[in-house]
């Protein structure tokens, strides 16, 4: 398996991970926006990405793009929050560009999205770019819920 990834030159930030499993058909892509990248890279999918792939297959997509509201790579949100620039210098550019390639955009960044007001910023950025964001559910605080913590058959909702 190989995933196309776009990293910063020092690999401190991962802006985009693309995973496609059916090259015989035209690309039908879904974009997911999480909190921040973990260790997933060109060679491996983490549990969240495997869950996302299952959702995409169920809904007849053959590709997904994974982006995040913060592009800094960390497995712990506490570590990400200590970073001086967790967003990354090119993240907003990649969010807008990638959204143009996708039939569906699903937000899933959870409650930590309130850090630096980033949840509201990204919703405004993509809404201003003419995009409609969806989610699989919301946290108690009203943020788009993470897919690992939801049943596999949950229905999409517009944010």
Where in this protein do the model-derived segments appear?
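Glycine/proline-rich loop-helix segments at beta-alpha junctions forming the active-site rim
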Residues: 80-159
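Short, glycine/serine-rich, charged loops/turns that create anion-binding
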Residues: 37-39, 71, 112-113
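Residues at the starts of beta-strands that form the adenosine-phosphate
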Residues: 29, 62-63, 104, 132
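A short mixed-secondary-structure module that forms the rim of ligand-binding clefts
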Residues: 38-60
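Short connector loops at secondary-structure junctions
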Residues: 62-78
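Short acidic (Asp/Glu) patches
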Residues: 11, 15, 46-53, 85-93
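Active-site and ligand/interface coordination hotspots across diverse enzymes
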Residues: 1-46
């Amino acid at each position: 398996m190989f995933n196309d990834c776009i990293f910063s030159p020092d690999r401190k930030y991962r802006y985009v991970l693309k995973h496609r499993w059916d090259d015989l058909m035209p690309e039908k892509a879904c974009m997911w926006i999480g909190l921040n990248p973990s260790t997933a890279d060109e060679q491996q999918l983490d549990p969240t990405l495997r869950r996302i792939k299952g959702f995409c297959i169920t809904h007849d997509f053959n590709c997904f793009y994974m982006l995040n509201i913060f592009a800094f790579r960390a497995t712990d949100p506490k570590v990400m929050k200590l970073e001086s620039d967790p967003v990354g210098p090119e993240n907003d550019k990649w969010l807008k560009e990638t959204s143009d390639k996708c039939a569906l955009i699903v937000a899933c960044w959870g409650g930590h999205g309130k850090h630096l007001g980033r949840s509201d910023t990204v919703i405004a950025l993509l809404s201003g770019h003419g995009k409609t964001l969806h989610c699989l559910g919301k946290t108690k605080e009203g943020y788009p819920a993470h897919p690992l913590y939801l049943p596999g058959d949950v229905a999409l909702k517009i944010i």
